[in-house]
Regions:
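A basic, amphipathic helix-loop patch mediating RNA/tRNA/ribosome contacts
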Residues: 16-59
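Generic structural motif recognizing short loop/turn segments at the entrances and edges of beta-strands
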Residues: 5-7, 41, 68-69
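A detector for short, charged/polar N-terminal pre-domain segments
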Residues: 2-14
Length: 77
């Protein structure tokens, strides 16, 4: 996968929770769908399967769902 395939998702704060990012990036319709995908092991954070919907994501973290990868871009401190 090349960097062109990774969509950057800007966030307002220095951190966002996984479930929130999935909705913000339009990878899921709602929190129920996010929870289901995470529970079924279909969400990867930085290349590893993540099972916590509340996982904190920071600048540079990547999330992959259904072959689509997004990258968290936080504002500079």
């Amino acid at each position: 996968m090349s960097n062109q395939d990774i969509e950057e998702i800007p966030i307002r704060d220095s951190m966002i929770r996984l479930g929130q990012l999935l909705k913000l990036a339009s990878l899921v319709e709602d929190g129920v769908e996010a929870a289901e995908l995470i529970r079924n092991g279909l969400v990867k954070v930085n290349g590893g399967i993540e099972d916590r919907r509340g996982r904190q994501l920071h600048n540079g973290d990547t999330v992959t769902v259904n072959g689509q990868t997004v990258k968290v871009v936080a504002p500079e401190a």
